[in-house]
């Protein structure tokens, strides 16, 4: 059966996803940045409260995936901490200036990962050549690649996703970015064994007093009195749709 990974931005949301039948959690902070390394407090709660596999992301900042020396030192420390806390897997990715896999740095992070399964995240979608990248990640021992098929969303990337799935001699190709109830069957149809979704809904703030004219974000369009959370009902339906493939 195709596995369902849910991207969660809090332990509370991860617990909802677990209860709804998710197979695995990708744990992140900062949805507006596309996912950053979660705090120590979040990691500690996750390892104590969740029973399904949790893969924290290691991404020290938003923006591109070509990191300074300081950024990379932070990443190494985070990978080591996540390993020592007992997580089953970890998510990261590093590119060089030319958009290729940064092999020396990836080798260091892979070594620090120990026995954890490694997911190479959507830095893959920014790679210069996905076929070369797939071969390099195979040689590195990466367990899976999260990708939209180098498109803005995974449905547009279906042709490349299918090619990568058929070509892979190692890493699991996991579709992510815009995977929803309405299109999940398309990823099953091309043979993928894992999909990734946020399955989210907007939660309104419980605050009744709202200070006018003051925001914390540099983006004035952001609604700071709402946040994203996993929709357990959506996770249940998606998991049910994946389960049906067992009987087809």
Curated annotation (Swiss-Prot):
One of its GO terms (cellular component) is cytoplasm. It holds the Pfam family CutC. The keyword Cytoplasm applies. It is found in: Cytoplasm. Belongs to the CutC family. It comes from Photorhabdus laumondii subsp. laumondii (strain DSM 15139 / CIP 105565 / TT01) (Photorhabdus luminescens subsp. laumondii). PANTHER family: COPPER HOMEOSTASIS PROTEIN CUTC (PTHR12598), COPPER HOMEOSTASIS PROTEIN CUTC HOMOLOG (PTHR12598:SF0). GO terms for molecular function: copper ion binding. Keywords: Cytoplasm. The keyword Zinc-finger does not apply. InterPro entries: CutC-like, CutC-like_dom_sf. This is PF03932 family protein CutC.
């Amino acid at each position: 059966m195709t596995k369902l990974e849910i991207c969660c931005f809090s332990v509370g949301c991860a617990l909802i996803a677990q209860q709804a039948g998710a197979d695995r959690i990708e744990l992140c902070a900062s949805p507006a940045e596309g996912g950053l390394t979660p705090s120590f407090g979040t990691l500690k709660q996750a390892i104590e409260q969740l029973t399904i596999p949790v893969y924290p992301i290691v991404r020290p900042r938003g923006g591109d995936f070509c990191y300074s020396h300081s950024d990379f030192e932070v990443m190494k420390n985070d990978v080591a901490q996540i390993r020592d806390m007992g997580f089953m897997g970890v998510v990261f990715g590093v590119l060089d200036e030319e958009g290729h896999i940064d092999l020396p740095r990836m080798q260091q992070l892979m070594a620090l990962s120990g026995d954890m399964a490694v997911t190479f995240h959507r830095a893959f979608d920014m790679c210069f050549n996905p076929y070369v990248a797939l071969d390099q990640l195979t040689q590195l021992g990466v367990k899976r690649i999260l990708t939209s098929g180098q498109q803005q969303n995974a449905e547009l990337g279906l042709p490349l996703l299918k090619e990568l799935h058929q070509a892979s001699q190692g890493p699991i190709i996991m579709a992510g970015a815009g995977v929803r109830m309405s299109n999940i069957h398309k990823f099953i149809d091309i043979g993928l064994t894992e999909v990734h979704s946020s399955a989210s809904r907007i939660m309104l703030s419980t605050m009744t007093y709202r200070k006018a004219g003051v925001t914390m974000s540099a983006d004035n369009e952001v609604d700071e009195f709402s946040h994203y959370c996993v929709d357990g009902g959506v996770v249940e339906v998606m998991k049910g749709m994946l389960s049906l493939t067992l009987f087809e």
